[in-house]
Structures are given as structure tokens and as C-alpha cells.
Amino acid sequence: DILAAFRVTPQPGVPPEEAGAAVAAESSTGTWTTVWTDGLTSLDRYKGRCYHIDAVPGEENQYICYVAYPLDLFEEGSVTNMFTSIVGNVSGFKALRALRLEDLRIPPAYVKTFQGPPHGIQVERDKLNKYGRPLLGCTIKPKLGLSAKNYGRAVYECLRGGLDFTKDDENVNSQPFMRWRDRFLFCAEALYKAQAETGEIKGHYLNATAGNCDEMIKRAVFARELGVPIVMHDYLTGGFTANTTLSNYCRDNGLLLHIHRAMHAVIDRQKNHGMHFRVLAKALRMSGGDHIHSGTVVGKLEGGRNITLGFVDLLRDDFIEKDRTRGIYFTQDWVSLPGVLPVASGGIHVWHMPALVEIFGDDSVLQFGGGTLGHPWGNAPGAVANRVVLEACVQARNEGRDLAREGXDIXREATKWSPELAAACEVWKEITFTFEEVDKLDY
């Protein structure tokens, strides 16, 4: 069975048992009345069952309801169908004040019907020939308004300075100021020029997201013809059907696939309604993507450390034990489905590097947009600063130093041989994002 953990807030006067049963019925075989066609099938074989209910500590009228769904309710290899069944209609139920899908357990038999990420972590490292450290990226800013030529110039400067990747922002598609074909051409030119000068393999996430699947695939085909290593998709606004289509194309044609989670907070930010990001992360691993944005813990976006590390493990590891202290409600076995690299991006700069390396480890992408392009000396020095402090942190960690405790000292020591890093450290020494988390663990 597929197991689901729902956070249920019933309307006043509705007992939790009734609310849980209603959720199970509405998201499987039930409707609001008995119908004569019920007798034409075996409802016991197909209906969802609410098998356990826990009260949420500290909340007066919230419950975690566990529901089991028989596998025959779902089309093989379709995240679209899975979500249509489990959360397609039930969240608007009048008997519920709010409903949030906290977690899913996907059984191995169903996991095996998905191809998952186009390539996975190890294959990506082999393609890039980069090992033993996190990968470095940068989102080109301003996100909208640059001409294709100026955009390509910024890409070149960042890659030449030492970054592994640069990135289209999520809302860069094909606007009047920069049509997609022009952007692809100038970025490919920048990428090859930077590769020739540095001797390293470089990439730029060319956003193939479009208004329809045919146009999306046309853009991916053009990227492949240019010989670039990676394309990008906004998987929530684009939809799971489009995402799986693009993932299959990338797998067949040797392209890596970077995934942006634009629109996720509309779905996952409220604590009592919607769907937690760990569910969206699991769905992405099934649908297909080699990278996905996961929050930073230390930057400008919402996400506590334990919760974030919980779904980072769900993205990367093959077997993840149940651990409510990290928000993981079920043990998940991915039966060797390739892993996804988490991307830490959003309001991070050189002073965050020790914490990011300590939190995310080597199998991650650390992406500094303003933290590269905001350098007072320019884009290339910003990239140099990030590469120097990253390599200093990795070396210090490998020597046995404690990044959490000695991180600031490690960065200061590295400034002695990098004036670019010294300038970056001075500019961002007082920039912090300290706000209370909205989504906290109950346990």
C-alpha cells in the first residue's frame, strides 16, 4: 500500500475518527452517498483505510491521520495520477477546517514503475569530472531585463572566476527583452569560452520551461544541439506530466536536468494546510530531476535544519529510516532509484560557506546569486571569493577541523591569500536573515 500521513483539522463537532474516515473515502472510492454501482465492484479491495490517528502535541484540534491506499488505485509511473487521487479533491472538504499531507510512504513495487532522475549523483560527477566537494553555482541577476548578450557576459565572468554552474532564474523563459534562442546561443558561447580558459567542465542551467510540452522539448533539443550539459525546468508551475516528459528526453540524450521549485511555498508553507515539501521532494525524485532547490537553513528562505536535512536525505539516500525528529513519518526504501542533488540557494554569501558545507556535505550544489554578482569588484571576483572559501572549508574539514565552531576563523584565514575573498567578507559581514520559522516540528 501507499501510506499517507495527513494533518487533519476537523470542523468543530466533527470527531477525528469521522474526519479521518472521510479523508480516506474521498481520496479513494467513496462519495457523499451510497450508490447502486458500489455493488458492481469489490470496494474492500480498492477503498482507502484510515488505520491510525494521533493527536498533535500542543494543538487543540489537530490530528495526524494515517491512511493506506491499495496500489491498484494508481497508474504505474504517474506522479500526476498519484496526486490526483490522494490530494486532488479532499482538501476542499467542508467537514475539515484544514488538511495537510505531511508525508507519503511509496512502496518498492510502485517505486519500480518510475525511472526517476535522468542520471543521478554519481553519473553527474563523472560527466563533470568533479569529486570531493560541493558544486558551486550562481543565479544570474537581475533576473529579468538583461539583453541576451549582457546575460551571456555575466555567465562567462562567473564561470571563468571558478564556478561550476550558472543558472537562469525560474521566471526567465522567452520574454520580449531576451528570447530563448538568443539566450541559449550567448550562454553556450560563454560556457565554451570559460571552459577553454579554465580547463574545467562548466554548465549553465538553460530554462526549457515553456507554455506547452512541444515548445519545452524544442528548447531542450536546441540545448542538446549546442552541446551544453544541462537544462532546467520549473516542475511545479510546469506540471508533473511535463516534468516527466522532459526527464525522459534528458535521460535519452545525455542532458542533466536542474529542477526549480517555483510556487512550492504556495503549497507547503502553511503548517496546517496544503502539502509538505518532503512530499513534493519525493514526487520529484520519482518524476525525474538531477538537482532540486531545497532551501539553505541559513539563508533568506524558510526551512529549519532538522526538517531540511530530513528531505535532503530523502532526495539523496537509498534507504531512510522513520525519524519524527526530522519530520520523516515513514521508512522509505528507494530500491536503488538514482539520487537527486539538493541545491542550497537564496540569500547566502561567503560567511555562510562553512555552515553550508557542514550541513549539506559534498553531494550538494551551493548557489550564490547576489553573493557572487554583488561583489564590489565585479562578477568574476565574486566567483573567485566563493571558490576560495569553499576550497578552504573543504580542506579544513578534511583536516578534521570543526566547521560549525571554527567556520569564521577558517574564512578569515583564507582572506590572507585572496583579496577577492577579503573584499566579500567585508561587504557581507553583517548580513543575516533571522526570522522565526513558520513550519516547526511537533516532536
UniProtKB/Swiss-Prot annotation:
Single GO term (MF): magnesium ion binding
Cofactor(s) listed: Mg(2+)
Record-listed substrate binding positions: N89, T139, K143, R261, H293, S345
Subcellular location(s) per record: Plastid, Chloroplast
Record field: catalytic activity: 2 (2R)-3-phosphoglycerate + 2 H(+) = D-ribulose 1,5-bisphosphate + CO2 + H2O; D-ribulose 1,5-bisphosphate + O2 = 2-phosphoglycolate + (2R)-3-phosphoglycerate + 2 H(+)
Gene Ontology cellular component annotations, sorted alphabetically: chloroplast
Binding site for Mg(2+): K167, D169, E170
Signal sequence segment: none
Entry PTM: The disulfide bond which can form in the large chain dimeric partners within the hexadecamer appears to be associated with oxidative stress and protein turnover.
Site feature location: Transition state stabilizer: K300
Single GO biological process annotation from the record: reductive pentose-phosphate cycle
EC number of this enzyme: 4.1.1.39
PROSITE patterns: RUBISCO_LARGE (PS00157)
Record-annotated active site: K141 (proton acceptor), H260 (proton acceptor)
Location of N6-carboxylysine modifications: K167
Main localization of the protein described in the UniProt heading: plastid
Cited PANTHER family: RIBULOSE BISPHOSPHATE CARBOXYLASE, RIBULOSE BISPHOSPHATE CARBOXYLASE LARGE CHAIN
Miscellaneous remark of the record: The basic functional RuBisCO is composed of a large chain homodimer in a 'head-to-tail' conformation. In form I RuBisCO this homodimer is arranged in a barrel-like tetramer with the small subunits forming a tetrameric 'cap' on each end of the 'barrel'.
Function: RuBisCO catalyzes two reactions: the carboxylation of D-ribulose 1,5-bisphosphate, the primary event in carbon dioxide fixation, as well as the oxidative fragmentation of the pentose substrate in the photorespiration process. Both reactions occur simultaneously and in competition at the same active site.
Quaternary structure note: Heterohexadecamer of 8 large chains and 8 small chains; disulfide-linked. The disulfide link is formed within the large subunit homodimers.
Family named by the database record: Belongs to the RuBisCO large chain family. Type I subfamily.
Protein name per Swiss-Prot or TrEMBL: Ribulose bisphosphate carboxylase large chain
Organism, scientific name: Borago officinalis
Higher taxonomy: Eukaryota, Viridiplantae, Streptophyta, Embryophyta, Tracheophyta
Gene label: rbcL
